[in-house]
Amino acid sequence: MLKFIFMLMFMFPLSFLKNFYWTVQNLIFLLTFMFMINLSSLNYFNYISYYFGLDMVSYGLILLSFWICGLMLMASEKVFSTNNYEKLFVFMILFLLFMLVLTFSSMSVFMFYLFFEASLIPTLFLILGWGYQPERLQAGVYLLFYTLLASLPLLIGIFYILNSKNTLSFTLLLNYSFSNFNLLYLSLVFAFLVKMPMFLVHLWLPKAHVEAPVSGSMILAGILLKLGGYGLLRMFSLLQISGVKYNYWWISISLVGGVLISLVCLRQTDLKALIAYSSVAHMGIVLSGLLTMTYWGLTGSYALMIAHGLCSSGLFCLANISYERMGSRSLLINKGLLNFMPTLSLWWFLLCSGNMAAPPTLNLLGEISLLNSIVSWSWITMIMLSFLSFFSAAYSLYLFAYSQHGKIYSGVYFFSVGTTREFLLLMLHWLPLNLLILKSNFCMLWI
Protein backbone atom coordinates (compact mmCIF):
# COMPACT_ATOMS: atom_id res chain seq x y z
CA MET A 1 0.00 0.00 0.00
CA LEU A 2 2.87 2.31 0.81
CA LYS A 3 4.09 2.04 -2.78
CA PHE A 4 0.84 3.63 -4.02
CA ILE A 5 1.07 6.47 -1.53
CA PHE A 6 4.67 7.14 -2.62
CA MET A 7 3.77 6.96 -6.29
CA LEU A 8 1.08 9.56 -5.68
CA MET A 9 3.55 11.78 -3.83
CA PHE A 10 6.06 11.57 -6.65
CA MET A 11 3.34 12.54 -9.15
CA PHE A 12 2.96 15.98 -7.55
CA PRO A 13 5.98 17.52 -9.36
CA LEU A 14 4.78 16.03 -12.67
CA SER A 15 1.69 18.21 -12.53
CA PHE A 16 3.86 21.32 -12.89
CA LEU A 17 5.67 20.19 -16.03
CA LYS A 18 4.57 21.50 -19.41
CA ASN A 19 2.01 19.39 -21.30
CA PHE A 20 1.96 16.60 -18.71
CA TYR A 21 -1.84 16.64 -18.34
CA TRP A 22 -2.54 13.36 -20.14
CA THR A 23 0.60 11.72 -18.75
CA VAL A 24 -0.67 12.27 -15.22
CA GLN A 25 -4.06 10.88 -16.22
CA ASN A 26 -2.47 7.75 -17.71
CA LEU A 27 -0.37 7.32 -14.58
CA ILE A 28 -3.50 7.48 -12.41
CA PHE A 29 -5.06 4.71 -14.51
CA LEU A 30 -1.85 2.69 -14.24
CA LEU A 31 -2.04 3.18 -10.48
CA THR A 32 -5.66 1.97 -10.51
CA PHE A 33 -4.82 -1.25 -12.32
CA MET A 34 -1.80 -1.92 -10.12
CA PHE A 35 -4.05 -1.42 -7.11
CA MET A 36 -6.60 -3.85 -8.53
CA ILE A 37 -3.97 -6.54 -9.03
CA ASN A 38 -2.86 -5.97 -5.44
CA LEU A 39 -6.14 -7.27 -4.03
CA SER A 40 -5.61 -10.17 -1.68
CA SER A 41 -8.30 -11.41 0.68
CA LEU A 42 -8.70 -8.31 2.80
CA ASN A 43 -11.42 -9.41 5.19
CA TYR A 44 -9.10 -8.64 8.06
CA PHE A 45 -7.10 -5.44 8.45
CA ASN A 46 -4.02 -5.43 6.30
CA TYR A 47 -1.64 -3.21 8.23
CA ILE A 48 0.94 -0.94 6.66
CA SER A 49 2.02 0.54 9.97
CA TYR A 50 0.48 1.34 13.33
CA TYR A 51 -1.46 4.22 11.80
CA PHE A 52 -2.36 2.90 8.37
CA GLY A 53 -4.20 -0.21 7.31
CA LEU A 54 -6.63 -1.49 4.71
CA ASP A 55 -9.67 -3.67 4.83
CA MET A 56 -12.27 -4.50 2.20
CA VAL A 57 -14.30 -1.30 2.67
CA SER A 58 -11.31 1.01 2.35
CA TYR A 59 -10.05 -1.01 -0.59
CA GLY A 60 -13.21 -0.49 -2.64
CA LEU A 61 -13.41 3.20 -1.85
CA ILE A 62 -9.73 3.86 -2.59
CA LEU A 63 -10.13 2.05 -5.91
CA LEU A 64 -13.17 4.21 -6.66
CA SER A 65 -11.15 7.33 -5.75
CA PHE A 66 -8.37 6.43 -8.20
CA TRP A 67 -10.88 5.63 -10.93
CA ILE A 68 -12.95 8.80 -10.52
CA CYS A 69 -9.85 11.02 -10.37
CA GLY A 70 -8.56 9.55 -13.64
CA LEU A 71 -11.97 10.19 -15.20
CA MET A 72 -12.06 13.74 -13.80
CA LEU A 73 -8.95 14.62 -15.77
CA MET A 74 -10.51 13.06 -18.85
CA ALA A 75 -13.75 15.02 -18.41
CA SER A 76 -12.01 18.35 -17.81
CA GLU A 77 -10.29 18.48 -21.17
CA LYS A 78 -11.59 22.04 -21.57
CA VAL A 79 -9.35 23.23 -18.73
CA PHE A 80 -6.39 21.86 -20.69
CA SER A 81 -7.42 23.14 -24.13
CA THR A 82 -8.27 26.66 -22.92
CA ASN A 83 -5.07 26.71 -20.85
CA ASN A 84 -7.03 27.60 -17.71
CA TYR A 85 -4.28 27.10 -15.09
CA GLU A 86 -4.20 23.41 -15.96
CA LYS A 87 -1.03 22.70 -13.96
CA LEU A 88 -2.61 23.97 -10.76
CA PHE A 89 -5.77 22.06 -11.64
CA VAL A 90 -3.90 18.75 -11.97
CA PHE A 91 -2.08 19.48 -8.73
CA MET A 92 -5.39 20.07 -6.92
CA ILE A 93 -6.80 16.78 -8.18
CA LEU A 94 -3.66 14.86 -7.17
CA PHE A 95 -3.63 16.51 -3.75
CA LEU A 96 -7.30 15.63 -3.26
CA LEU A 97 -6.65 12.04 -4.32
CA PHE A 98 -3.72 11.83 -1.91
CA MET A 99 -5.90 13.07 0.97
CA LEU A 100 -8.67 10.61 0.10
CA VAL A 101 -6.32 7.63 -0.02
CA LEU A 102 -4.92 8.60 3.38
CA THR A 103 -8.44 9.09 4.80
CA PHE A 104 -9.57 5.65 3.73
CA SER A 105 -6.47 3.94 5.04
CA SER A 106 -6.22 5.67 8.44
CA MET A 107 -6.38 3.46 11.49
CA SER A 108 -6.19 6.23 14.06
CA VAL A 109 -9.40 8.18 14.64
CA PHE A 110 -7.58 11.50 14.82
CA MET A 111 -5.66 10.95 11.59
CA PHE A 112 -8.90 9.96 9.93
CA TYR A 113 -10.43 13.23 11.14
CA LEU A 114 -7.43 15.23 9.94
CA PHE A 115 -7.47 13.88 6.38
CA PHE A 116 -11.28 13.88 6.32
CA GLU A 117 -11.20 17.64 6.88
CA ALA A 118 -8.17 18.22 4.65
CA SER A 119 -10.00 16.77 1.64
CA LEU A 120 -12.36 19.74 1.92
CA ILE A 121 -9.66 22.27 1.00
CA PRO A 122 -8.81 21.13 -2.57
CA THR A 123 -12.55 20.65 -3.23
CA LEU A 124 -13.16 24.23 -2.18
CA PHE A 125 -10.36 25.43 -4.47
CA LEU A 126 -11.80 23.43 -7.38
CA ILE A 127 -15.20 25.10 -6.90
CA LEU A 128 -13.80 28.61 -6.33
CA GLY A 129 -11.13 28.41 -9.01
CA TRP A 130 -12.79 26.62 -11.91
CA GLY A 131 -16.53 27.09 -11.20
CA TYR A 132 -18.78 28.87 -13.68
CA GLN A 133 -20.84 31.57 -11.91
CA PRO A 134 -19.96 34.28 -9.39
CA GLU A 135 -22.33 32.57 -6.92
CA ARG A 136 -19.66 29.92 -6.44
CA LEU A 137 -18.35 32.01 -3.53
CA GLN A 138 -21.65 31.52 -1.73
CA ALA A 139 -21.56 27.79 -2.53
CA GLY A 140 -18.03 27.59 -1.13
CA VAL A 141 -19.09 29.30 2.09
CA TYR A 142 -22.05 26.92 2.48
CA LEU A 143 -19.80 23.90 1.91
CA LEU A 144 -17.19 25.13 4.36
CA PHE A 145 -19.50 26.19 7.17
CA TYR A 146 -21.84 23.21 7.13
CA THR A 147 -18.93 20.79 7.20
CA LEU A 148 -16.74 22.63 9.70
CA LEU A 149 -19.55 23.46 12.11
CA ALA A 150 -20.54 19.80 12.32
CA SER A 151 -16.93 18.63 12.54
CA LEU A 152 -16.00 20.60 15.63
CA PRO A 153 -18.05 18.37 18.00
CA LEU A 154 -16.39 15.38 16.30
CA LEU A 155 -12.97 16.73 17.22
CA ILE A 156 -14.07 17.28 20.83
CA GLY A 157 -15.51 13.75 20.92
CA ILE A 158 -12.21 12.34 19.64
CA PHE A 159 -10.29 14.16 22.38
CA TYR A 160 -12.75 12.85 24.97
CA ILE A 161 -12.09 9.29 23.76
CA LEU A 162 -8.33 9.88 23.91
CA ASN A 163 -8.65 11.26 27.43
CA SER A 164 -10.77 8.41 28.76
CA LYS A 165 -9.34 5.41 26.88
CA ASN A 166 -5.76 6.58 26.16
CA THR A 167 -5.79 5.30 22.59
CA LEU A 168 -7.23 6.37 19.26
CA SER A 169 -6.57 3.21 17.27
CA PHE A 170 -9.78 1.83 15.73
CA THR A 171 -8.78 -1.76 16.45
CA LEU A 172 -8.00 -1.14 20.12
CA LEU A 173 -11.17 0.91 20.66
CA LEU A 174 -13.26 -2.08 19.57
CA ASN A 175 -12.65 -3.55 23.04
CA TYR A 176 -14.41 -0.65 24.76
CA SER A 177 -18.06 0.22 25.09
CA PHE A 178 -19.27 3.81 24.80
CA SER A 179 -22.86 3.13 25.76
CA ASN A 180 -23.28 5.47 28.72
CA PHE A 181 -22.57 8.81 27.07
CA ASN A 182 -25.26 10.09 24.72
CA LEU A 183 -23.60 13.40 23.92
CA LEU A 184 -20.54 11.54 22.66
CA TYR A 185 -22.76 9.54 20.30
CA LEU A 186 -24.24 12.75 18.89
CA SER A 187 -20.89 14.47 18.47
CA LEU A 188 -19.25 11.47 16.75
CA VAL A 189 -22.15 10.85 14.38
CA PHE A 190 -23.34 14.31 13.40
CA ALA A 191 -20.32 15.31 11.30
CA PHE A 192 -20.83 12.27 9.09
CA LEU A 193 -24.58 12.88 8.81
CA VAL A 194 -23.84 16.34 7.39
CA LYS A 195 -21.27 14.90 5.01
CA MET A 196 -23.63 12.15 3.74
CA PRO A 197 -25.74 14.47 3.57
CA MET A 198 -28.80 13.67 5.65
CA PHE A 199 -32.05 15.46 4.85
CA LEU A 200 -32.30 18.79 6.79
CA VAL A 201 -28.52 19.35 6.58
CA HIS A 202 -28.28 18.72 2.84
CA LEU A 203 -28.57 22.31 1.65
CA TRP A 204 -24.86 22.75 0.88
CA LEU A 205 -24.84 19.85 -1.61
CA PRO A 206 -27.09 21.15 -4.43
CA LYS A 207 -25.43 24.57 -4.15
CA ALA A 208 -21.93 23.13 -4.36
CA HIS A 209 -22.89 20.85 -7.27
CA VAL A 210 -24.53 23.56 -9.33
CA GLU A 211 -21.58 25.94 -8.98
CA ALA A 212 -18.79 23.36 -9.28
CA PRO A 213 -16.99 22.53 -12.54
CA VAL A 214 -17.54 19.03 -13.89
CA SER A 215 -14.50 17.67 -12.03
CA GLY A 216 -15.73 19.15 -8.74
CA SER A 217 -19.17 17.62 -9.23
CA MET A 218 -17.70 14.23 -10.09
CA ILE A 219 -15.46 14.01 -7.05
CA LEU A 220 -18.18 15.43 -4.79
CA ALA A 221 -20.82 12.92 -5.91
CA GLY A 222 -18.36 10.09 -6.42
CA ILE A 223 -16.20 10.13 -3.30
CA LEU A 224 -16.81 12.95 -0.84
CA LEU A 225 -20.37 11.85 -0.03
CA LYS A 226 -18.99 8.37 0.63
CA LEU A 227 -16.66 9.75 3.30
CA GLY A 228 -19.72 10.23 5.51
CA GLY A 229 -20.85 6.64 5.01
CA TYR A 230 -17.34 5.32 5.58
CA GLY A 231 -16.99 7.36 8.78
CA LEU A 232 -20.31 6.02 10.10
CA LEU A 233 -19.27 2.44 9.29
CA ARG A 234 -16.11 2.94 11.32
CA MET A 235 -17.78 4.80 14.19
CA PHE A 236 -20.64 2.34 14.66
CA SER A 237 -18.18 -0.41 15.48
CA LEU A 238 -17.63 1.66 18.66
CA LEU A 239 -21.16 2.99 19.19
CA GLN A 240 -23.28 -0.13 18.81
CA ILE A 241 -25.31 0.14 22.01
CA SER A 242 -26.06 3.87 21.65
CA GLY A 243 -26.81 3.18 17.99
CA VAL A 244 -29.51 0.65 18.80
CA LYS A 245 -31.04 3.19 21.19
CA TYR A 246 -31.05 6.31 19.01
CA ASN A 247 -30.68 5.40 15.35
CA TYR A 248 -34.41 5.41 14.70
CA TRP A 249 -34.33 9.23 14.67
CA TRP A 250 -31.96 9.42 11.75
CA ILE A 251 -33.65 6.57 9.88
CA SER A 252 -37.05 8.26 10.07
CA ILE A 253 -35.64 11.62 8.98
CA SER A 254 -33.72 10.02 6.09
CA LEU A 255 -36.65 8.04 4.72
CA VAL A 256 -39.21 10.85 4.94
CA GLY A 257 -36.57 13.25 3.63
CA GLY A 258 -35.75 10.92 0.73
CA VAL A 259 -39.39 10.98 -0.39
CA LEU A 260 -39.61 14.78 -0.08
CA ILE A 261 -36.35 15.25 -1.97
CA SER A 262 -37.63 12.93 -4.73
CA LEU A 263 -40.63 15.24 -5.08
CA VAL A 264 -38.25 18.22 -5.24
CA CYS A 265 -36.41 16.38 -8.07
CA LEU A 266 -39.62 16.25 -10.09
CA ARG A 267 -39.82 20.05 -10.02
CA GLN A 268 -36.24 20.82 -11.10
CA THR A 269 -35.44 22.56 -14.37
CA ASP A 270 -31.68 22.59 -13.80
CA LEU A 271 -29.94 19.40 -14.97
CA LYS A 272 -27.19 19.54 -12.37
CA ALA A 273 -29.55 20.40 -9.51
CA LEU A 274 -31.77 17.44 -10.42
CA ILE A 275 -28.84 15.01 -10.34
CA ALA A 276 -27.60 16.58 -7.08
CA TYR A 277 -30.98 16.20 -5.37
CA SER A 278 -31.23 12.62 -6.60
CA SER A 279 -27.89 12.02 -4.82
CA VAL A 280 -29.46 13.23 -1.57
CA ALA A 281 -32.38 10.80 -2.04
CA HIS A 282 -30.02 7.88 -2.73
CA MET A 283 -27.84 8.76 0.23
CA GLY A 284 -30.97 8.85 2.42
CA ILE A 285 -31.64 5.19 1.73
CA VAL A 286 -27.92 4.33 2.17
CA LEU A 287 -27.93 6.09 5.53
CA SER A 288 -31.08 4.31 6.69
CA GLY A 289 -29.68 0.89 5.78
CA LEU A 290 -26.37 1.65 7.44
CA LEU A 291 -28.05 2.77 10.67
CA THR A 292 -30.08 -0.44 11.01
CA MET A 293 -26.67 -2.00 11.76
CA THR A 294 -27.69 -5.35 10.25
CA TYR A 295 -25.48 -7.42 7.96
CA TRP A 296 -27.69 -6.76 4.93
CA GLY A 297 -27.82 -3.07 5.76
CA LEU A 298 -24.07 -2.59 5.98
CA THR A 299 -23.27 -4.59 2.85
CA GLY A 300 -26.11 -3.00 0.88
CA SER A 301 -25.08 0.52 1.86
CA TYR A 302 -21.51 -0.21 0.77
CA ALA A 303 -22.68 -1.63 -2.58
CA LEU A 304 -24.97 1.34 -3.22
CA MET A 305 -22.22 3.79 -2.25
CA ILE A 306 -19.89 2.32 -4.88
CA ALA A 307 -22.68 2.13 -7.48
CA HIS A 308 -23.91 5.65 -6.81
CA GLY A 309 -20.36 6.97 -7.07
CA LEU A 310 -20.06 5.64 -10.62
CA CYS A 311 -23.62 6.36 -11.76
CA SER A 312 -24.00 9.88 -10.45
CA SER A 313 -20.51 10.85 -11.63
CA GLY A 314 -21.43 9.62 -15.13
CA LEU A 315 -24.65 11.66 -15.10
CA PHE A 316 -22.71 14.80 -14.19
CA CYS A 317 -20.40 14.11 -17.15
CA LEU A 318 -23.43 13.86 -19.43
CA ALA A 319 -24.87 17.10 -18.08
CA ASN A 320 -21.51 18.77 -18.69
CA ILE A 321 -21.27 17.48 -22.27
CA SER A 322 -24.67 19.04 -22.99
CA TYR A 323 -23.66 22.22 -21.14
CA GLU A 324 -20.50 22.61 -23.25
CA ARG A 325 -22.55 22.37 -26.48
CA MET A 326 -25.63 24.35 -25.43
CA GLY A 327 -24.15 26.81 -22.96
CA SER A 328 -27.01 26.15 -20.55
CA ARG A 329 -28.01 23.65 -17.88
CA SER A 330 -31.72 24.38 -18.12
CA LEU A 331 -34.09 21.58 -19.13
CA LEU A 332 -36.08 24.18 -21.07
CA ILE A 333 -33.12 24.55 -23.43
CA ASN A 334 -31.67 21.04 -23.17
CA LYS A 335 -34.75 19.41 -24.67
CA GLY A 336 -35.13 17.32 -27.78
CA LEU A 337 -31.49 16.27 -27.50
CA LEU A 338 -32.38 13.13 -29.45
CA ASN A 339 -32.38 15.39 -32.52
CA PHE A 340 -29.28 17.28 -31.45
CA MET A 341 -26.90 14.56 -30.21
CA PRO A 342 -28.43 11.18 -31.14
CA THR A 343 -25.23 9.28 -30.29
CA LEU A 344 -25.40 10.49 -26.71
CA SER A 345 -29.00 9.43 -26.09
CA LEU A 346 -27.95 5.82 -25.53
CA TRP A 347 -25.69 6.94 -22.67
CA TRP A 348 -28.42 9.12 -21.21
CA PHE A 349 -30.70 6.10 -21.22
CA LEU A 350 -28.14 3.71 -19.72
CA LEU A 351 -27.12 6.01 -16.89
CA CYS A 352 -30.68 7.15 -16.11
CA SER A 353 -31.75 3.52 -15.88
CA GLY A 354 -28.74 2.92 -13.62
CA ASN A 355 -29.92 5.80 -11.44
CA MET A 356 -33.34 4.17 -11.01
CA ALA A 357 -31.64 0.88 -10.02
CA ALA A 358 -32.61 -1.16 -13.05
CA PRO A 359 -30.89 -4.53 -13.52
CA PRO A 360 -28.07 -5.39 -14.22
CA THR A 361 -26.53 -2.41 -12.43
CA LEU A 362 -24.87 -2.61 -9.03
CA ASN A 363 -27.51 -0.11 -7.79
CA LEU A 364 -30.06 -2.93 -7.97
CA LEU A 365 -28.01 -5.19 -5.68
CA GLY A 366 -27.50 -2.37 -3.19
CA GLU A 367 -31.13 -1.28 -3.16
CA ILE A 368 -32.50 -4.81 -2.73
CA SER A 369 -30.18 -5.42 0.23
CA LEU A 370 -31.14 -2.07 1.74
CA LEU A 371 -34.87 -2.70 1.30
CA ASN A 372 -34.39 -6.07 3.04
CA SER A 373 -32.53 -4.57 5.95
CA ILE A 374 -34.79 -1.57 6.51
CA VAL A 375 -38.01 -3.60 6.29
CA SER A 376 -36.58 -6.22 8.67
CA TRP A 377 -35.81 -3.37 11.08
CA SER A 378 -39.41 -2.13 11.01
CA TRP A 379 -42.18 -3.06 8.60
CA ILE A 380 -43.80 0.42 8.79
CA THR A 381 -40.89 1.73 6.69
CA MET A 382 -42.39 -0.17 3.74
CA ILE A 383 -44.68 2.81 3.09
CA MET A 384 -41.80 5.26 2.71
CA LEU A 385 -39.61 2.78 0.84
CA SER A 386 -42.29 2.05 -1.75
CA PHE A 387 -42.72 5.80 -2.34
CA LEU A 388 -38.96 6.23 -2.52
CA SER A 389 -38.51 3.46 -5.10
CA PHE A 390 -41.41 4.73 -7.19
CA PHE A 391 -40.32 8.36 -7.23
CA SER A 392 -36.71 7.34 -7.86
CA ALA A 393 -37.86 5.73 -11.11
CA ALA A 394 -40.14 8.71 -11.77
CA TYR A 395 -37.47 11.41 -11.63
CA SER A 396 -34.98 9.30 -13.61
CA LEU A 397 -37.61 8.91 -16.33
CA TYR A 398 -38.43 12.61 -16.07
CA LEU A 399 -34.77 13.49 -16.58
CA PHE A 400 -34.46 11.21 -19.60
CA ALA A 401 -37.79 12.03 -21.23
CA TYR A 402 -37.58 15.79 -20.81
CA SER A 403 -34.00 16.05 -22.02
CA GLN A 404 -34.22 13.62 -24.96
CA HIS A 405 -37.78 13.89 -26.26
CA GLY A 406 -39.89 16.83 -27.32
CA LYS A 407 -39.33 19.68 -29.70
CA ILE A 408 -35.75 20.89 -29.98
CA TYR A 409 -34.95 24.37 -28.67
CA SER A 410 -35.37 26.83 -31.54
CA GLY A 411 -32.10 28.62 -30.79
CA VAL A 412 -30.08 25.55 -31.79
CA TYR A 413 -29.26 25.53 -35.50
CA PHE A 414 -26.71 22.76 -35.65
CA PHE A 415 -26.18 19.07 -35.12
CA SER A 416 -23.47 17.75 -32.83
CA VAL A 417 -21.60 14.51 -32.34
CA GLY A 418 -19.64 13.53 -29.27
CA THR A 419 -15.90 13.02 -29.34
CA THR A 420 -14.23 9.67 -28.73
CA ARG A 421 -12.94 11.00 -25.42
CA GLU A 422 -16.48 11.62 -24.21
CA PHE A 423 -17.72 8.19 -25.22
CA LEU A 424 -14.75 6.53 -23.54
CA LEU A 425 -15.43 8.60 -20.43
CA LEU A 426 -19.06 7.43 -20.27
CA MET A 427 -18.08 3.86 -21.10
CA LEU A 428 -15.63 3.82 -18.18
CA HIS A 429 -18.42 4.91 -15.85
CA TRP A 430 -20.97 2.45 -17.15
CA LEU A 431 -18.88 -0.72 -17.56
CA PRO A 432 -17.73 -1.09 -13.93
CA LEU A 433 -21.27 -0.26 -12.80
CA ASN A 434 -22.66 -3.26 -14.68
CA LEU A 435 -19.73 -5.64 -14.35
CA LEU A 436 -19.39 -5.31 -10.58
CA ILE A 437 -22.71 -7.08 -10.00
CA LEU A 438 -21.09 -10.19 -11.52
CA LYS A 439 -18.37 -10.01 -8.85
CA SER A 440 -20.61 -8.93 -6.01
CA ASN A 441 -18.76 -10.89 -3.32
CA PHE A 442 -16.50 -7.82 -2.95
CA CYS A 443 -19.55 -5.79 -1.99
CA MET A 444 -21.42 -8.38 0.03
CA LEU A 445 -18.84 -10.51 1.83
CA TRP A 446 -16.58 -8.08 3.61
CA ILE A 447 -17.85 -8.22 7.18
From Swiss-Prot:
One of its GO terms (molecular function) is ubiquinone binding. Pfam families: Oxidored_q5_N, Proton_antipo_M. The keyword Lyase does not apply. Its EC number is 7.1.1.2. It is a multi-pass membrane protein. One of its GO terms (cellular component) is mitochondrial membrane. The chain crosses the membrane at residues 28-48, 56-76, 89-109, 110-130, 141-161, 183-203, 213-233, 246-266, 273-293, 298-318, 331-351, 374-394, 409-431. Coiled coil: none annotated. Keywords: Electron transport, Membrane, Mitochondrion, NAD, Respiratory chain, Translocase, Transmembrane, Transmembrane helix, Transport, Ubiquinone. This is NADH-ubiquinone oxidoreductase chain 4. It comes from Anopheles gambiae (African malaria mosquito).
